Regions:
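Short, Lys/Arg-enriched N-terminal segments with co-localized hydrophobic residues
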Residues: 17-38
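Rossmann-like adenosine-cofactor binding region
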Residues: 312-382, 388-390
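Adenosine-phosphate binding glycine-rich loop
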Residues: 231-232, 251, 360-473, 496, ...
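N-terminal ligand-binding/catalytic initiation module
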Residues: 40-228, 462, 489-523
Length: 523
């Protein structure tokens, strides 16, 4: 006979079920069938999440449950593990006498060798495969200014993805960019990066609010001796372009012919527009909106504020007819690219209904898209992409920056050019098309490990073509090196888990997170 005390997992299952039954009696929400959903366990891979969300919930409620679940799980998991990253040696300790070589007195030879030739720092230290993830946390996802340490979760997450997907070591550096007046000063970030660049192979800028982000990136790209990459802007642009390439193939339209509406004019969308135009789109056939309306040459507020020079550049080349409203702009538009604010219901179904046949809709606000995919489809969208992995067609930086940074590091590039970003987009699109694409699967997923070395090799070759590489190699050499580093990173992580050095997440943490999410939605 079963007794709860003798079976922990079944005890947890019984407790969750009992709580749910009580809740059902009180609120008359959970049916008998729904109780069976709660009784089942979430897999550690989380791949059965949708099966455990009650069928009686609407699509909107189900989407909210998923969002709330991942937020609750994130909080519990980060607290359980005390963050996501740690430092481990890459060299052996065969005995304590080895510290005489790894440290003093032997390490003196390393110091003088690098002093005499700074380039040897890439061979004699871990610098060549190390990226600083730098942020002042002034625009963290859709949560705004989170104070300097508030960005640590995202920055550590970026470093986590770099390592696991790209075989690149990353370190989170959240800095305080506020001056004596309390205002965020971009020069503080610029000075910090320029002073610390000699410890890294590349810099990844993250979650810096506009307009400061424009100055920080543009100055550092020119004044640093290592690549400086703004992932919110350049990374988003790269992956969006990759998705757009394949979406256009599926609807048999050409980039140079389509009408594009950009909803949101922050760093991400402004850079997307610039990169998409560089890839062949006609800027005169595009219209961009910020929170004050459409961009065009009549926007004196943008022209007069020199901090927004990137937006003013777009005012001069887009929307020649000075269309003022989204309703008018969306008439016969082929593509909508929205990166504005978290939804849903930020993008209206009525707008999508005005679009051309076989319309393409990218709604990439995080953590909730401007309109849910099902609603966009109901309004007539043919292809819908979001920034989330739990919906079809995830257009997320995670498929781009690990390979791009790896490619730049492999050839010791001095910068990442726009051509390198476009090469990455083309590589992602080509890889995705080769393995097969359709309207619900336009771009490779981060689980497809082969895309990253493929992308890295193409980026490395473009760096050589652009004359910014310090190291020459063939495409195959770059591919093999990236693939081996990625394999080693994944194998190391697996070994740490298999041998108990990284504890597996407790089943209770998963089940309770889902229970909390469902209760928050159902009341």
């Amino acid at each position: 006979m079963w007794h709860p005390a003798k079976d922990t997992h079944r005890s947890v299952c019984w407790i969750i079920c009992a709580r749910s039954i009580v809740h059902s009696f009180n609120c008359h929400i959970f049916t008998l069938n729904q109780k069976q959903y709660i009784m089942a366990h979430l897999n550690l891979t989380l791949d059965n999440l949708e099966e455990l969300i009650p069928d009686s919930l609407s699509q909107d409620q189900k989407a909210k449950v998923k969002t709330l679940f991942y937020k609750e799980l994130a909080l519990r998991a980060h607290r359980f593990y005390n963050g996501k990253m740690q430092t481990l040696p890459k060299a052996p300790v065969m005995g304590f006498n080895w510290f005489n070589a790894w440290y003093t007195p032997g390490v003196s030879k390393i110091s003088t060798t690098i002093r005499d030739d700074n380039d040897t720092s890439y061979e004699l230290s871990g610098r060549g495969n190390l990226v600083a993830v730098v942020s002042d946390s002034t625009r963290v996802l859709g949560d705004g200014d989170c104070t300097p340490p508030g960005g640590m979760g995202v920055m550590e997450g970026k470093a986590f993805l770099m390592k696991y997907l790209g075989g690149v070591n990353g370190i989170a550096l959240c800095v305080d960019s506020r001056g004596p007046d309390g205002k965020n000063d971009p020069q503080k970030i610029i000075d910090f990066v320029k002073m610390s660049q000699h410890s890294f192979g590349a810099i990844n800028l993250e979650d810096i609010a506009q307009p400061n982000c424009y100055k920080v990136l543009d100055v550092l790209r020119e004044e640093c001796d290592i690549p400086v990459w703004h992932d919110d802007a350049q990374g988003t642009a790269c992956v969006t372009l990759a998705g757009l390439f394949n979406a256009l193939k599926l609807v048999d339209k050409k980039l140079e012919d389509v009408k594009i509406v950009y909803f949101g004019a922050g760093a991400s969308n402004a850079t997307i527009a610039r990169i998409v135009n560089s890839a062949g789109a006609d800027p005169a056939r595009s219209i961009m909106f910020d929170s004050s309306g459409a961009l065009h040459t009549g926007r004196k507020d943008i022209e007069e504020d020199k901090r927004f020079y990137r937006k003013w550049e777009l005012c001069q080349v887009t929307n020649p007819h000075k269309v003022e409203t989204m309703e008018e702009a969306m008439k016969d538009a082929d593509v909508l690219i929205a990166l504005s604010r978290p939804g849903p219901d930020v993008v209206k179904k009525e707008w999508i209904e005005k679009m051309a046949d076989k319309s393409i809709v990218f709604v990439c606000a995080n953590p909730v898209p401007e309109i849910y995919p099902y609603a966009a489809k109901e309004a007539g969208a043919h292809i819908v992409a979001t920034g989330r992995g739990d919906f079809p067609n995830q257009v997320n930086n995670s498929i781009g920056f690990p390979g791009i940074l790896k490619g730049a590091l492999i050839v010791r590039a001095s910068k990442i050019t726009d051509n390198m970003a476009i090469a990455a987009a083309e590589a992602i699109a080509r890889f995705s098309e080769k393995r097969g694409i359709h309207t619900e699967d336009i771009i490779a997923k981060m689980s497809e490990s082969e895309v990253f070395p493929f992308e890295a090799a193409d980026v490395a070759m473009q760096a050589i073509k652009d004359g910014v590489a310090r190291k020459e190699m063939t495409w195959q050499e770059a591919y093999d090196l990236a693939k081996e580093d990625i394999k080693q990173a994944r194998d190391t992580t697996k070994s740490l888990i298999d041998n108990g050095f990284i504890e597996k997440p407790p089943q209770e943490m998963l089940d309770e997170s889902l229970e909390v999410a469902i209760k928050q939605v159902t009341g």
